[in-house]
Curated annotation (Swiss-Prot):
The lineage of its organism: Eukaryota, Metazoa, Chordata, Craniata, Vertebrata. Homodimer; disulfide-linked. Interacts with the serine proteases, HTRA1 and HTRA3: the interaction with either inhibits TGFB1-mediated signaling and the HTRA protease activity is required for this inhibition. May interact with THSD4; this interaction may lead to sequestration by FBN1 microfibril assembly and attenuation of TGFB signaling. Interacts with CD109, DPT and ASPN. Interacts with EFEMP2. Interacts with TSKU; the interaction contributes to regulation of the hair cycle. Interacts with TGFBR3. This is Transforming growth factor beta-1 proprotein. Keywords: Cleavage on pair of basic residues, Disulfide bond, Extracellular matrix, Glycoprotein, Growth factor, Mitogen, Secreted, Signal. Disulfide bonds join 285-294, 293-356, 322-387, 326-389. The gene is TGFB1.
Length: 390
């Protein structure tokens, strides 16, 4: 370029900037986050989910359906799936990023309480203020071979009809037949059964590391200093007098259990190689006509959209996705233009403006078959609940 033109360049640049962008005007038009056709976005999201599910399950391709037994799912599998689904539904999405190990699917296992007929219960004095629940640690270790693989453990029990309000406490069996306090709940009167849940992740990790053959919990009425009657008024399904016939089987299936979520051994070695990070939420975005960054609805039918028949529950789910511009104010009286120029110099392929990305995500429990065996797993970060500009 001739020297005379070089001398004019500093004078022309301010005029060019004024033509392109007036002071205080949103600079969203300069974003390299391209506007994409909605249908194209949905198709790309569906294909991404196809790969995401297979990746989380460590499957190179969808399982064969040739050996799947006909008929409905086994009752035990369906009960485990329902328990997992109910737990997820009861939790709100966390806005913080999940730790690296939470990227891969967790294998969900239900370990039932040792039956009431076991001798361990006969060795404990029967009292009106407490009931006891013991578990076989060999069953726990079979489900989770390494304590470090355990992501979460919950003690779940079904409370039957309750006529009076009662404060209850949970204790862990400790050394020398003593009991260590864990947590408490205030139960209100109800005519319908209700599932109670206690987080016992730390306790189960201890049992997996150095527990005895049988370990247990004590579920007690709160011992109030000013009350003479500390009787436990709560009746727990599966604990109590033996039933006969079909009722005995139902009674046994409904007894308290531990719900374990753990990373399978075959996936543990891959934890270091992948990361997945997780506002504008569904309550706002689904009820407004917001054009900027927001959660957009997307329902995926496993059979229709992915051509999959190997996932038995659920039939589909609301995956959702984030879409919309992220405008910002760019004034000529700021230093932002200098920063942006330097940023683009070092990151020529990056966006010049913030992009709309997921902020909070929730897991998806599924039931699928591997050969003739039905499995329940929880896939993390599958449902977009809120978005942000980043």
């Amino acid at each position: 370029m001739p020297p005379s033109r070089l001398r004019l360049l500093p004078l022309l640049l301010p005029l060019l900037w004024l033509l392109v962008l007036a002071p205080g005007r949103p600079a969203s038009g300069l974003s390299t986050c391209k506007t994409i056709d909605m249908e194209l976005v949905k198709r790309k999201r569906i294909e991404a989910i196809r790969g995401q599910i297979l990746s989380k399950l460590r499957l190179a391709s969808p399982p064969s359906q040739g050996d799947v037994p006909p008929g409905p799912l086994p009752e035990a599998v369906l009960a485990l799936y329902n328990s997992t689904r109910d737990r997820v539904a009861g939790e709100s999405a966390e806005p913080e990023p999940e730790p690296e190990p939470d990227y891969y699917a967790k294998e969900v296992t239900r370990v039932l309480m040792v039956d009431n007929s076991h001798n361990i219960y006969k060795s404990i004095e029967t009292v009106a203020h407490s009931i006891y629940m013991f578990f076989n640690t060999s069953e726990l270790r079979e489900a989770v071979p390494d304590p470090l693989l355990l992501s979460r453990a919950e003690l779940r029990m079904q409370r039957l009809k309750l006529n009076v309000e009662q404060h209850v406490e949970l204790y862990q069996k400790y050394s020398n037949n003593s009991w260590r306090y864990l947590s408490n709940q205030l139960l209100t009167p109800s005519d319908t059964p209700e599932w109670l849940s206690f987080d016992v992740t730390g306790v189960v990790r201890q049992w997996l590391s150095q527990g005895e053959e049988l370990e247990g919990f004590r579920f007690s009425a709160h011992c109030s200093c000013d009350s003479k009657d500390n009787t436990l008024r709560v009746e727990i399904n599966g604990i109590g007098p033996k039933r006969r016939g079909d009722l005995a089987a139902i009674h046994g299936m409904n007894r308290p259990f531990l719900l374990l979520m753990a990373t399978p051994l075959e996936r543990a070695q891959h934890l270091h190689s992948s990361r997945h990070r997780r506002g504008l939420d569904t309550n706002y975005c689904f009820s407004s006509t917001e054009k900027n960054c927001c959660v957009r609805q997307l329902y995926i039918d496993f059979r229709k959209d992915l051509g999959w028949k190997w996932i038995h529950e659920p039939k589909g789910y609301h995956a959702n996705f984030c879409l919309g511009p992220c405008p910002y104010i760019w004034s000529l009286d700021t230093q932002y233009s200098k920063v942006l120029a330097l940023y683009n110099q070092h990151n020529p392929g990056a966006s010049a403006a913030p992009c709309c990305v997921p902020q909070a995500l929730e897991p998806l429990p599924i039931v699928y078959y591997v050969g003739r065996k039905a499995k329940v797993e929880q896939l993390s970060n599958m449902i977009v609940r809120s978005c942000k500009c980043s």
